[in-house]
Amino acid sequence: MLDITEIKKIIPHRYPMLLIDRVEELIPGEKAVAKRNVTINEELFNGHFPGNPVMPGVLIVEALAQTGAVALLSLPEFKGKTAYFGGIKSAKFRKVVRPGDSLRLEVTLEKIRNNVGLGKAIATVDGKKACTAELTFMIG
């Protein structure tokens, strides 16, 4: 398991855009499973939506991307680099994520060639799918 200090050694994201709290499983170059504890104290809930707080879908996808970046950037050849979005395909949102939810983020890398990685991503809350997507990463 990686705590927030160890995550920050792998990916460059910082508050307020660091969207994963811990990594529970890591197989470098293959898979990462992370957690995000969604709290009402996050500034974004003041406007999304007042009286009906919902985590924006784009931030769920970003949290998945950060999880995938941990899996990629844990490889020795990518240490110290940055993983950028190369593409988002087939993103589907199936469940609303609210404050108090614990978001489980899982990314399985299916292909890595040169500086490009492809992965399947799934976010769940209480075992129910909240978001699925196919992500492309560019390593720079």
Swiss-Prot record:
Organism field: Ligilactobacillus salivarius (strain UCC118) (Lactobacillus salivarius)
SUPFAM superfamilies: Thioesterase/thiol ester dehydrase-isomerase
Keyword DNA-binding part of the UniProt annotation: no
EC number per UniProt: 4.2.1.59
Family stated for the protein in its record: Belongs to the thioester dehydratase family. FabZ subfamily.
Molecular functions per Gene Ontology: (3R)-hydroxyacyl-[acyl-carrier-protein] dehydratase activity
GO terms for biological process, alphabetical: fatty acid biosynthetic process; lipid A biosynthetic process
Name of the protein this chain belongs to: 3-hydroxyacyl-[acyl-carrier-protein] dehydratase FabZ
Active-site residues, as the UniProt record annotates them: 48
Keyword terms of this UniProt record: Cytoplasm, Lipid A biosynthesis, Lipid biosynthesis, Lipid metabolism, Lyase
